[in-house]
């Protein structure tokens, strides 16, 4: 029997402003967790990866796990290639972080105080019509689905 690769992904400390770790999540296989309290309104981590156009994203033959984030109207980031660890931040309909494109960089900011041990989440929902995916975030205000970039 082949041993399963149990190597847990890591956070790139150059991309994170706080002590974070990737670990098992109840929302998905992996999630990102705060190891210290994070105040409201603070930059938490930068989402890094390969820059792609919408056309390149649309034509990707998606593997099992996809780590595509929308930066702005033209550019997307593929976190599976050179990702900072932020690609393991899971979706919630009631997230504790939001993302902003600042000078061609995709940054995650805390929406409220995040406590040590808490899983970091963002809303994956894009403001365009895309494929709907079932959401299992467990938030009290869960919408049940979110729109996803790939078909």
State where each predicted segment sits.
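C-terminal SET catalytic tail plus cysteine-rich post-SET Zn-binding segment of SAM-dependent SET-domain
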Residues: 3-5, 93-151
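Catalytic cores of histone-lysine modification enzymes
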Residues: 2-99
């Amino acid at each position: 029997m082949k041993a399963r690769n149990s190597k847990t992904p890591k956070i790139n400390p150059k991309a994170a402003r706080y002590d974070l770790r990737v670990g098992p999540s109840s929302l998905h296989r992996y999630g990102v967790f705060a190891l210290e309290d994070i105040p409201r309104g603070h930059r938490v981590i930068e989402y890094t990866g390969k820059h792609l156009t919408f056309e390149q994203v649309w034509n990707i033959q998606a593997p099992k796990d996809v780590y595509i984030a929308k930066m702005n109207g033209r550019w997307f980031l593929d976190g599976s290639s050179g990702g900072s660890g932020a690609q393991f931040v899971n979706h919630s309909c009631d997230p504790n972080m939001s993302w902003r494109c600042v000078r061609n960089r995709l940054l995650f900011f805390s929406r409220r105080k995040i406590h040590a041990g808490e899983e970091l989440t963002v809303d994956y929902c894009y403001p365009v019509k895309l494929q709907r995916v079932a959401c299992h975030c467990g938030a009290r205000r869960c919408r049940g689905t979110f729109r996803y970039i790939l078909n």
